[in-house]
Amino acid sequence: MSGGEVVCSGWLRKSPPEKKLKRYAWKRRWFVLRSGRLTGDPDVLEYYKNDHAKKPIRIIDLNLCQQVDAGLTFNKKEFENSYIFDINTIDRIFYLVADSEEDMNKWVRCICDICGFNPTEEDPVKPLTGSSQAPVDSPFAISTAPASSQMEASSVALPPPYQVISLPPHPDTLGLQDDPQDYLLLINCQSKKPEPNRTLFDSAKPTFSETDCNDNVPSHQTPASSQSKHGMNGFFQQQMMYDCPPSRLTSVSGESSLYNLPRSYSHDVLPKESPSSTEADGELYTFNTPSGTAGVETQMRHVSISYDIPPTPGNTYQIPRTFPESTLGQSSKLDTIPDIPPPRPPKPHPTHDRSPVETCGVPRTASDTDSSYCIPPPAGMTPSRSNTISTVDLNKLRKDASSQDCYDIPRTFPSDRSSSLEGFHSQYKIKSVLTAGGVSGEELDENYVPMNPNSPPRQHSGSFTEPIQEPNYVPMTPGTFDFSSFGMQVPPPAHMGFRSSPKTPPRRPVPVADCEPPPVDRNLKPDRKVKPAPLDIKPLSEWEELQAPVRSPITRSFARDSSRFPMSPRPDSVHSTTSSSDSHDSEENYVPMNPNLSGEDPNLFASNSLDGGSSPMNKPKGDKQVEYLDLDLDSGKSTPPRKQKSSGSGSSMADERVDYVVVDQQKTLALKSTREAWTDGRQSTESETPTKNVK
């Protein structure tokens, strides 16, 4: 198109269609902006393959342009620092890349002058609700508006990622007396011993807190906390020093950062504070290092260190009152005593006629038993894990076990273990059987495999009827024990059953009915021919295909004022890719079977060309229609409509097309019967012809 005046020309990189932005190359083309204001020609933007070409590749009608955006960004690597603007038309968005900021501003200014575009008023708000893609900073600004308006627009138009963030003041500048902080700095925390002049409430702190198990939790002290608005009468002066609320309602001191011993420890073993400090401390019981023996302090340190979280009131442990302090001091060397006390047997019977091996055993740990009742171990007795136990230790153990009182100690085990035991006496008999065999009485004979082939058969009591299975592994014991008397004693440790065969691995007997074969994985079979899984080929999602340059904080949009410049009707030559003519075709009736169109007429719109409006595409269809008409020549009823349709397709008369849009049922049935009759006659003719030739 050479009728218009050339306003601007130069090299620009053009984007492919929106659905091919990332897969197709951005071609460098020679663009020419023409204005038909003086010549009467339409305003167009043409681009050529090079600056010497005479025929444009495409003509963009600026009358269809709706908006121009300048200062876009694209997340493609080669366009990180590019100057991108777009021309938004009715049919497509053209993204153009300029070589410099000046070129981009020049093109945008010229296009806006021709189209009559002005900066949009709602543009400063658009970046806040625009695309979800995060825009990147652009190294340029638009100079189509005054500098003052640009500064004002840029200050208002910045989305949240680009706004200046006002940092809050440093925590050091804020006084702690304003509001309690969520976090405390370790710089402001101090840890020291209580002073004599401190309040009665603070004197209840244990003096060993800075050297015992609470070294990792500093005792927070802040001098400014005395001015807190929460301080009523000086009694709650240290409420601000802790980052979590106190553990009890009546306690607001810093004792929440220390480990609070349960109430049960303070009955007979712990030396209490003065009554005044105990009342001030509420439910908390503490003790000081100077008062009390070294054995008690050592025992309590073991207790406090071994718990990460204080137990609930229903799960506290009771220490037997008959144990002397020396016994506690000796037993404090055992690491497993505070956590897992050994199981408790019933009252011991005279043991003069039993051997040491049959009458006594070392208490078992938590991994060997799940009983809900335990007794403390004898003083000075450590759980031996060897295969032999001296007679002296066994006698001492039996003596201590028979002379001490036993107390029930609830244990924090899962409910499925403890709830399954009904009676203590029957339960303990079951425990002794489980320790020896691991199964009920009905299953002992069929599941038991003796370790020693020469051992006599097993003898068991008839009271073992409840089928309970040991969750941990249970060793097989030789059949030399008297189970009727053995059930009344402390169960032997796990290693006692392997004295005759220490190399035999442990075996857990399971009923045959409970055994299920593992599932068979056929895919593990060697040389198995399996059909490969179908390839999961997914088309690119829409957001990946339509990923386009996005708006940045300095993007400016220009659009036409609809009141001053109404949109003109869409011309027919908007989709032309090879046209250089500005003439418009007023024919709006689309006839796909017309062989005279789109071959010589270059102004055919895209829908005609896309549907095959050229003469090479129409010729096969025309032959097909002629062949179809030849099939109906024998029927006089259907011939006139077929002739009318043939002539109508060539003359493109609207009334003849309407006759074929409305379907007549009688005519359709008549046409069908005629076609079937002709087909039968033709087939019979073709079958007779070869026979005549053969004769």
Curated annotation (Swiss-Prot):
Residues the record lists as Phosphothreonine modifications: 388, 639
Positions of modified residues (N-acetylserine): 2
Amino acid composition bias (Basic and acidic residues), ranges on this chain: 673-685
Name under which the protein is recorded: GRB2-associated-binding protein 1
Subunit structure: Identified in a complex containing FRS2, GRB2, GAB1, PIK3R1 and SOS1. Forms a tripartite complex containing GAB1, METTL13 and SPRY2. Within the complex interacts with METTL13. Interacts with GRB2 and with other SH2-containing proteins. Interacts with phosphorylated LAT2. Interacts with PTPRJ. Interacts (phosphorylated) with PTPN11. Interacts with HCK.
The protein's role, per its UniProt record: Adapter protein that plays a role in intracellular signaling cascades triggered by activated receptor-type kinases. Plays a role in FGFR1 signaling. Probably involved in signaling by the epidermal growth factor receptor (EGFR) and the insulin receptor (INSR). Involved in the MET/HGF-signaling pathway.
SUPFAM superfamilies cross-referenced by the UniProt entry: PH domain-like
Tissues where the protein occurs: Expressed in the inner ear (at protein level). Expression is detected in the cochlear duct, spiral limbus region, efferent and afferent nerves, and in spiral ganglion neurons (at protein level).
Annotated positions of the Phosphotyrosine modification: 628, 660
Gene Ontology biological process: cellular response to vascular endothelial growth factor stimulus; epidermal growth factor receptor signaling pathway; epidermis development; heart development; interleukin-6-mediated signaling pathway; labyrinthine layer development; MAPK cascade; platelet-derived growth factor receptor signaling pathway
The family this protein is said to belong to: Belongs to the GAB family.
Tree of life domain: Eukaryota
Biased composition range(s): Polar residues: 206-229, 314-334, 457-466, 605-617, 686-695
A cellular component term, taken from the record's GO annotations: cell cortex
CDD domains, per the entry: PH_Gab1_Gab2
Region (Disordered): 204-229, 306-387, 453-659, 671-695
Pfam families assigned: PH
Post-translational modifications reported in the UniProt record: Phosphorylated on tyrosine residue(s) by the epidermal growth factor receptor (EGFR) and the insulin receptor (INSR). Tyrosine phosphorylation of GAB1 mediates interaction with several proteins that contain SH2 domains. Phosphorylated on tyrosine residues by HCK upon IL6 signaling. Phosphorylated in response to FGFR1 activation.
One MF annotation (Gene Ontology) recorded for this entry: signaling adaptor activity
